Regions:
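Sequence-structural signature of the catalytic-core scaffold of metal-dependent phosphohydrolases
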Residues: 1-40, 47-271
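Terminal helices and disordered tails flanking the catalytic cores of nucleotide-processing hydrolases
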Residues: 215, 223-378
Length: 378
């Protein structure tokens, strides 16, 4: 909420408004209203997250549901309506800004609403991403996620979108969050911080396997293997409730989630058996799947896990205004931004019971499995 407020105050400062987008900026009274709505949207943006956040979401909600839809339901709930009434804020304005155009399908976004939602959920400069990088790096005790957020925010501007092939003239009058040329190094630092946090922390193989064990536990424990979408039940289900049940399950061999709970509580998690390399990718684009299938045949499906992930929303193309007033694509102004890698992982894990035997098997068979594309359809 604090970062969203800072961005809003900077980009609506009359001295910072580009002439081509001045017409979309509301009058002063409306500016005060939209500042309140934006702050509440930033505060409510993650209301719909399940216990332990993203770890549980993909396979543990009924079809058609995700945390953005749950967020919308919570914002619109009867419990929240008195708050919006007291604040003189329309709940639908809060909902739109909180989840953005990709997840709010009930009406179109005008240019102003699109910019405000971009402040929160934007791929390049969304404050949700700024916040979790800074927060997570602090609490984990690493420096990967740090960048100069104050310098970056001070140089943000609303600018017309620009096509990379159009070097001097904007490709569209549609506005987007961009940056002054003087802030380009801060933007580079943000995007590199995101890359390093994903490659070194979020996608670390041990962290990922605990997500898998947690998901397996929840599937075995929750009624029907999914979370309820009832607002009342959702609010009652917290991290503490899950942790308490997991601790209980780890001590009870008859509990349906015993095996997964024990992996977490006793730190006997599955171990990394295979991690795809660039060389493997050149030989077989589905090398991880091939190893997984072969390992399942050798050791049994219950002893093997497969985990893949490709980073989404690079959001590297944004407008940059030069000191002489010309507007360029970020990709033409920064080789660093152009070349930030996309994080992609492909892991195969083995149970501790089979680890030694599996490592010997891997040494003898890995090259053949990858080269022969064993069990993988073309």
């Amino acid at each position: 909420m604090e970062l969203a407020s800072r961005v809003y105050d900077v980009i609506t400062d009359p001295d910072n408004i580009h002439e081509s987008v001045r017409s979309i900026i509301p009058r002063k009274f409306d500016l005060e209203y939209w500042r309140r709505a934006l702050r509440m949207a930033a505060l409510c943006h993650d209301l719909g997250h399940l216990p332990f956040s993203h770890a549980a979401e993909r396979d543990l909600l009924p079809a058609g549901w995700d945390h953005e839809r749950l967020t919308l339901e919570l914002i619109r709930s009867g419990e929240m309506e008195p708050i919006w009434t007291a604040m003189k804020v329309n709940s639908e304005d809060v909902a739109k800004l909180a989840v953005g155009p990709k997840h709010y399908k009930d009406s179109r976004f005008d240019d102003w609403e699109a910019i405000l939602s971009e402040i929160i959920v934007g791929d390049a400069f969304g404050v949700d991403r700024m916040d979790y990088l800074l927060r997570d790096s602090h609490h984990i005790g690493v420096a990967y996620g740090r960048f100069d957020q104050y310098r970056l925010i001070d140089t943000l501007r609303i600018l017309p979108k620009v096509d990379r092939t159009s070097e001097e003239e904007p490709g569209s009058q549609e506005p987007a969050l961009g940056i002054e040329e003087g802030g380009i190094h801060s933007a580079e630092a943000l995007l590199l911080a995101r890359y390093f946090m994903f490659s070194q922390v979020y996608c670390h193989h041990v962290r990922r396997i605990y997500d898998i064990h947690l998901k397996d536990f929840l599937k075995s424990w929750l009624p029907g293997g999914v979370f309820s979408t009832s607002i009342e039940e959702l609010l009652r289900m917290t991290d503490s409730e899950v942790t308490q049940e997991l601790s209980k399950a780890a001590r009870d061999e008859n509990h349906p989630g015993f095996d997964s709970a024990r992996c977490i509580a006793k730190r006997v998690h599955f171990r990394l058996l295979y991690q795809r390399t660039r060389e493997d990718l050149e030989k077989n684009r589905e090398s991880g799947k091939a190893v997984f299938i072969a390992a399942c045949k050798e050791f049994g499906e219950s002893e093997v896990r497969h985990d893949t992930y490709i980073q989404k929303g690079s959001g590297l193309n944004f407008p940059v205004i030069a000191r002489d007033g010309r507007i360029f694509s970020s990709l033409s102004r920064s080789e660093t931004i152009e070349k930030v890698p996309v994080v992609a992982i492909d892991y195969v894990y083995i149970s501790p019971v089979c680890r030694k035997r599996a490592e010997t098997w891997r040494e003898k068979n890995l090259t053949r499995i990858i080269s022969s594309k064993e069990g993988v359809e073309e």
